[in-house]
């Protein structure tokens, strides 16, 4: 074990002791009248309040020491410098270059990638503007009214999430997303679409992703059957680097937009993968989105650790995961247009940090990535908040809420939304004692026998941690900041855990086996290594399908 690893291990042990020996409850910490001021940090209008966690001054100091011991600053600087920090794939990690609006040059392996980034963004802008203005039209001259993005994973979750989030800024064609190879997905999306006014974007770096190419073939047939083979080029664009394969599909070179191997799929929404968003909101708004992320990048690089939002968010995550032993975190945006944010963050976090070996291939010595899940409020309150408040597992909650909505005429809705968000975080912390529950029931005139029967069911343990991310309005700039905040939070946690947060070998085995099992599903033989369970399931599915 290196000296750095020794320091990290010692810091984790000290934090675990701080948790197990703590006295009192989170609510008791508010005896300090300035707790909110000392345990919340703002960057412009974007504020993180973590005062409703069990973190104290001493614990925060230990967490900051953990960040230093884990080499967060050095690893951060290595990422921005273009070093190959993705060791298993021998790649740089520079999605930040896609939104960098300050640097004159960005070096990767001695090559300045800035001109290519600028050129690609300009090409995307020209194409999006042409479609939005009707100059780039369908094969029969029809203005494009609908765009269907076909991708999966990072080629779907990112653009789908941000396009929904920025719906108030849509002034271009309607955007739809197809990801699942389930025929129901593309069938339902294509219903009601006019082939003559529909543009498909096929997003696959290699142009070989099975789910994406299966859906792309169906979309191609949709166009060919209605408009003829010659119409394919006018109704498709591609985000890919496989020029030969894309050309063979029928998509002309001027409709192919590439990105680089130093951009991971779950970090690619800033690249040509974000084309659906640009078509929906326009190039200028898209640049505002990039600018928000760039601002958070600069904050991450320059802010001192105890005022650094991504660092603090990462350290809070490490505290809850490793010191407190909480295995999951819930993301609850009080904004319906952020409905896809929890799913997006599931991939960002769980695909990055769901690792069981360190960067050098040794087994990790402590739990790593948590289970990330959630739904928007207030819907979530009527679904799973029962467990959050009274269940046997403690789940740290991360609330997101804006001060203003995009519907000023419905301010009463926003007021109710904000009140619910604040009430839930307060209730999770405060709880309700048996004495309070008893007094509340007695005040209603209920008999003593009934009070004794019901009161235990109305007790809330409380002392359940949450943090709140608050901002003015969900606009393109703010959304960019929020996504980059979470990207860097995941980076901080991976750095301290000593894992590679930029590969995803865990997705490979299932894909390999699916290729082996497909012949058996279609009537052939299973490989000898398949289990009796798989054989039995195939036989049952074949029987009930009438095969």
Swiss-Prot record:
InterPro entries: G6P_Isomerase (IPR001672), G6P_Isomerase_C (IPR023096), Phosphoglucose_isomerase_CS (IPR018189), SIS_dom_sf (IPR046348), SIS_PGI_1 (IPR035476), SIS_PGI_2 (IPR035482)
EC number: 5.3.1.9
GO process terms (BP): gluconeogenesis; glucose 6-phosphate metabolic process; glycolytic process
Location (main, coarse): cytoplasm
Compartments, as annotated in UniProt: Cytoplasm
Active site: 351 (proton donor), 382, 511
Enzyme class at the top of the EC tree: isomerase
PROSITE patterns in alphabetical order: P_GLUCOSE_ISOMERASE_1, P_GLUCOSE_ISOMERASE_2, P_GLUCOSE_ISOMERASE_3
Family annotation (SUPFAM superfamilies): SIS domain (SSF53697)
Keyword annotations from UniProtKB, A to Z: Cytoplasm, Gluconeogenesis, Glycolysis, Isomerase
Single GO MF descriptor: monosaccharide binding
GO cellular component terms listed in the entry, alphabetical order: cytosol
Catalytic activity entry: alpha-D-glucose 6-phosphate = beta-D-fructose 6-phosphate
Pathway per the UniProt entry: Carbohydrate biosynthesis; gluconeogenesis; Carbohydrate degradation; glycolysis; D-glyceraldehyde 3-phosphate and glycerone phosphate from D-glucose: step 2/4
Biological role stated in the UniProt entry: Catalyzes the reversible isomerization of glucose-6-phosphate to fructose-6-phosphate.
Cited HAMAP family: G6P_isomerase
Family: Belongs to the GPI family.
Name recorded for this polypeptide: Glucose-6-phosphate isomerase
Organism encoding this protein: Xanthobacter autotrophicus (strain ATCC BAA-1158 / Py2)
């Amino acid at each position: 074990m290196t000296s750095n690893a020794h320091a990290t291990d010692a810091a984790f042990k000290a934090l675990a002791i701080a948790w197990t020996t703590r006295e009192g409850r989170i609510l008791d910490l508010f005896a300090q009248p300035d707790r909110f001021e000392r345990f919340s940090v703002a960057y412009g209008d974007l504020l993180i309040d973590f005062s409703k966690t069990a973190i104290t001054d001493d614990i925060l100091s230990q967490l900051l020491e953990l960040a230093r011991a884990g080499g967060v600053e050095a690893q951060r600087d290595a990422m921005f410098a273009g070093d190959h920090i993705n060791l298993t794939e021998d790649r740089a990690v520079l999605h930040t270059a896609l939104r960098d609006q300050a640097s004159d040059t960005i070096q990767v392996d001695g090559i300045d990638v800035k001109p290519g980034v600028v050129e690609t963004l300009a090409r995307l802008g020209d194409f999006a503007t042409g479609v939005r203005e009707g100059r780039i039209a369908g094969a029969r001259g029809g203005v494009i009214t609908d765009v269907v993005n076909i991708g999966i994973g990072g080629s779907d979750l990112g653009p789908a999430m941000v396009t929904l989030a920025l719906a108030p800024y849509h002034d271009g064609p309607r955007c739809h997303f197809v990801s699942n190879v389930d025929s129901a997905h593309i069938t339902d999306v294509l219903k009601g679409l006019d082939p003559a006014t529909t543009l498909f974007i096929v997003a696959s770096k290699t142009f070989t992703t099975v789910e994406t190419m299966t859906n792309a073939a169906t979309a191609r047939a949709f166009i060919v059957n209605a408009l003829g083979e010659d119409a394919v080029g006018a109704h498709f664009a591609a985000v890919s680097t496989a020029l030969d394969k894309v050309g063979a599909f029928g998509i002309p070179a001027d409709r192919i937009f590439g990105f680089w191997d130093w951009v991971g799929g779950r970090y690619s929404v800033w690249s040509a993968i974000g084309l659906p968003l640009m078509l929906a909101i326009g190039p200028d708004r898209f640049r505002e989105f990039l600018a928000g992320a760039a601002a958070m990048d600069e904050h991450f690089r320059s802010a001192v650790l105890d005022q650094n939002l991504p660092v603090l968010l990462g350290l809070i995550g490490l505290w809850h995961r490793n010191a407190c032993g909480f295995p999951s975190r819930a993301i609850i945006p009080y904004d319906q247009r952020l409905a896809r944010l929890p799913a997006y963050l599931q991939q960002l976090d769980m695909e990055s940090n769901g690792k069981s070996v360190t960067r050098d291939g040794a087994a990790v010595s402590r739990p790593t990535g948590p289970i990330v899940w959630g739904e928007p409020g207030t819907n979530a309150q009527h679904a799973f908040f029962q467990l959050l408040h009274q269940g046997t597992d403690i789940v740290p909650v991360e609330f997101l809420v804006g001060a203003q909505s995009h519907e000023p005429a419905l301010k009463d809705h926003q007021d109710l939304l904000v009140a619910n968000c604040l009430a839930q975080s307060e209730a999770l912390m405060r709880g309700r004692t048996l004495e309070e529950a008893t007094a509340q029931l007695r005040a209603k005139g209920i008999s003593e026998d009934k009070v004794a029967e019901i009161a235990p069911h109305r007790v809330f343990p409380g002392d359940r941690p949450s943090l709140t991310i608050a901002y003015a309005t969900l606009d393109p700039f703010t959304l960019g900041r929020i996504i980059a905040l979470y990207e860097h939070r995941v980076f901080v946690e991976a750095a301290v855990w000593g894992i590679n947060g930029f590969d995803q070998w865990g997705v490979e085995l299932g894909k390999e086996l699916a290729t082996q099992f497909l012949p058996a599903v279609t009537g052939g033989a299973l490989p000898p290594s398949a289990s009796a369970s798989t054989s039995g399931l195939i036989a049952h599915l074949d029987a009930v399908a009438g095969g």
